[in-house]
């Protein structure tokens, strides 16, 4: 059986550790580093600085120089900025809005007739709000004034008036457009228009039809409008056919 020797002779070889000493700077040891980087801020009493210094010295001993890491200076040239192309889109032509026709003022209790006159009417609270016909007038102001006088008589100071500042001025009543006046005006207009055409039969027929239409319209707003048709029976007699 093999036995280990009781005593073993161990031989220790002293390890050689590089010890670096420096003066005020390391420029005497590595002048190339000093030329490139200047004096390195390494401290002798700092173990980490000494390790870095050892790596640098070993690399320097095998031929490494700081010039291998120096990058060539690149000349910076000004970059030409490309301006965005101007858009040449053509905006659509703007169409000017059509001039609005000026509308007349709307008065309370006033309606305009198809032939241009203005009718005034009011609802009577004493008759469960029934519509009361006040008349037809030449202008909207006259019809509005007639409505105001009637409303003031019915409701007093609670009435909503078109011209409240004109109440109590003792103004004359607005002139109504009566049936006779309308008939005379329409007849004269019909005669003038027919005289231009030069046909006496058409003139008499137009006057009679216009008179019949005005008679129906003058009976009030609740009367149904009717039509009429005229037939000539003799040289001076006419037959009028009226239907609803």
Curated annotation (Swiss-Prot):
GO BP, sorted A to Z: defense response; ethylene-activated signaling pathway; fruit ripening
SMART domains: AP2
Subcellular location: Nucleus
Keyword terms: Activator, DNA-binding, Ethylene signaling pathway, Fruit ripening, Nucleus, Plant defense, Transcription, Transcription regulation
Compositionally biased residues, Low complexity: 186-198
The keyword Zinc-finger is assigned to this record: no
Superkingdom assignment: Eukaryota
Annotated CDD domains: AP2
Tissue specificity comment: Present in stems.
Family named by the database record: Belongs to the ethylene-response factor family. Class 1 subfamily.
Annotated function: Involved in the regulation of gene expression during fruit ripening, by stress factors and by components of stress signal transduction pathways. Transcription factor that binds to the GCC-box pathogenesis-related promoter element. Probably acts as a transcriptional activator and may be involved in disease resistance pathways.
Protein's UniProt name: Ethylene-responsive transcription factor 1
Lineage: Eukaryota, Viridiplantae, Streptophyta, Embryophyta, Tracheophyta
Designated gene of the protein: ERF1
